[in-house]
Amino acid sequence: MAMMRLSTSASDGKANLHQGAVGVGICIATGKAVRAVQFDQPVTHHPDTGKELAALQVPHWEKLLTLASSAWEMTGLGYMGTDMVLDQEEGPMVLELNARPGLAIQIANGAGLLPRLHHIENLGTPAEYPKAAERVAYAAKQFGVHGSEIVSS
């Protein structure tokens, strides 16, 4: 699952959801917005700018996902949250890895995480683990969102 956090005047310029930032669920296959929430309630436009959130498309999406997926080799954690930024000069960068990430990502995506975790667990332990790019391709195919679920005004 993926989520983008957008700061607002209500969140005092911080990207903290509990302070009023907007959480935008992102399709794992495309990097496009699927749903957005503020204070756990659906929103279609940014409260300050008025921009339609359904129009959001994360640049360098595949690079971001591959970098996040490669964190598994570094940590061995089966489930983790990866906080990332897009630097103008350096591109995708990892800010931090969280062994116990928040669950607000489920609200922003309008979907539960448990079925995805069960799906992955049911795959079993392979003789050889797939590379990061292969894991990204698998997740995109299995967990991508269909067009009918995308936010609109």
What function would you assign to each model-found segment?
Residues 1-5, 13-16, 94-97:
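Beta-strand scaffold of nucleotide-dependent catalytic cores
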Residues 2-5, 25-29, 35-41, 115-123, ...:
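Low-complexity, flexible helical/coil segments
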Residues 7, 41, 100-102:
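A short acidic/small-residue loop/turn micro-motif
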Residues 10-87:
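A long amphipathic alpha-helix within ATP-dependent nucleotide-binding catalytic cores
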Residues 45-63, 73, 77, 86-153:
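C-terminal active-site "lid" helix and adjoining low-complexity regulatory extension at the edge
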